Amino acid sequence: MFVPCAENVNDLDFSGFTLILPAVSIGNVGQLATDLTISSLSSSRHLIGYLHDASILPVVGNDAFARLGHEKGELNLSAEVYQSTEKRLVIVQQRAPISKGHYANYCQKLLAWIKRCSFKQVVLLSSISATDRVDAQLQGSPLRYMTTSVSQQLSSSFDKLSWVQLEKRPKFPDMTKESDELQFYLPGGGVTKRFFDRCEKEDVPLAVLMTFCSEGDNIADAVSLFLYLNDWLEITNKDTVGVN
């Protein structure tokens, strides 16, 4: 699945590194926030390879990170992999959706690559539909998180940041007073729920950071999600977000 830029390299050892990647979800907020992350690391990140698989639709476009007067004529592809050794980060930017019917196959191959690379932890940036909120979610911050059981120690760190965990709901269709089984509900989240469940099953340390939103101009949602991530990982100074 991973295709390196350098020759004679298959997979790399990323022990101690945090992997950040987006879910293709409502409003494309996770992808926009990932663009902000990569752009904010311009002085320390470099392209190390690509993710290539039949489950990812082919896309090609102009350089998303070109600055006026400094265009290099580079192209962006469906799924690119960047590294910042200084920040101990590996960032995947996925610009294309997953083929219909291939979600399970995509999660399986992506997770196999993640485990081979020995990442310290994985962060998935996502979004969920604001129209499906319950009453408790209508007030306060639209930002939420959830973590797999193996990374529950992060919850104490998130509590210090006053973050709110995504509220669970009664399992549909058993929404009765007698039903006490709860689950995460992620409408519009794309592959988020399936990937989370797979990481939970295989004891992969995963934190999902997400925001409630609707389709439209989602720039503000993306900035909020990136700042949410930045409060935790301290990727860049808040005053320089995306300016590089």
Swiss-Prot record:
GO biological process, one term: proteasome assembly
GO-annotated cellular components: cytosol; nucleus
InterPro entries tied to this protein: Proteasome_assmbl_chaperone_2 (IPR019151), Proteasome_assmbl_chp_2_euk (IPR016562), PSMG2_sf (IPR038389)
Transmembrane segments: none
Statement: the UniProt record of this protein carries the keyword Lyase: no
Keywords, in A-Z order: Chaperone, Nucleus
Compartment(s) where it occurs, according to its Swiss-Prot or TrEMBL record: Nucleus
General function of this protein: Chaperone protein which promotes assembly of the 20S proteasome as part of a heterodimer with psmg1.
Entry's family note: Belongs to the PSMG2 family.
Subunit structure: Forms a heterodimer with psmg1.
The name this protein goes by in its record: Proteasome assembly chaperone 2
Gene designation: psmg2
